[in-house]
Amino acid sequence: MNRRKFLQTASAMPAAAAAAQWPLSAFAAAEGGNAWRMFEVTTRVELLKPSGVSKIWLPVPLLADKDFHKSLGNTWSAPGGDVRFVTEDKYNMGVVAAEIPAGVDKPALTVVSRFATRDREVDISKPNGAPAENPAVLKLNLQPTELIPTDGIVRETSRDILKNVKGNDLVRARAIYEWVVDNTFRDAKVRGCGWGDIKSMLETRNFGGKCGDLNAMFVGLCRSAGIPARDLYGIRVAKSNHGYVSMGANTEVISRAQHCRAEFYVAGYGWIPADPADEIGRAHV
């Protein structure tokens, strides 16, 4: 996976690509000097030992534009194969899927994604008048998943954390965040971002993991307490503004820069980013 920052107008996209509608002039300035930065990321998967028909899929960046992220479009290619863009409606995710027939030497799928991003900050000292979230979205982000249940030991742990906590959801989420930071740790032996199997972590009392585990723990404990929360998977594309080498992309090749973080929702504040894994990880820089 390769990343390069680009500052020129993107060239015309092939008809098969998802074309963006955001002119570069829209990113010329940002409130408070929080400038937009534009990136191009190329992701390529090549199967070295194919057997029969090859199927490859790759995710694309966020489909819905945010105040910290805008999509500028995606292009893709899979020589000798058929490619289609698929939208997963439940979580509003986009995937490029390729099917390449047997006999193609080293079948491969390449996706080039262009997007703009800027620093994200939420002032939690007071409500900011954020618009109310769609109730269906909040309901979705209170639901259990296979690896993030909200009953049993997860709910018991959440209740124990909050038993003496008084205050609104912001105060309660902060207490959960601090518990995760105080009780979990980064385990370098865990592959990738981890599985995020929080029930097993709590049952075994093995609180070591990677970003996918530690942020999933925060999300599950929040959901069990009735606080909408979700984990977001992506990849780091820029250097850390604070000088943390392991918390930024320090080369053009970002194949190992995958990261998971979390966010939770509080009425009047909107979605608030949280990353206990990076809080813990700073001790390992």
Predicted regions and their residues:
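Intrinsically disordered, low-complexity N-terminal segments that are enriched in acidic
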Residues: 10, 27-121
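Short beta-strand segments and strand-loop junctions that repeat across beta-rich extracellular domains
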Residues: 262-269
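Catalytic Cys-His active-site segments of thiol-dependent hydrolases/isopeptidases
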Residues: 272-279
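Active-site neighborhood of thiol-dependent amide/isopeptide-bond enzymes
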Residues: 164-173, 178-260
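N-terminal export signals
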Residues: 5-27
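Acidic low-complexity segments
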Residues: 88, 108-187, 191-205
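Conserved small/polar residues in nucleotide/adenosyl-binding loops
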Residues: 283-285
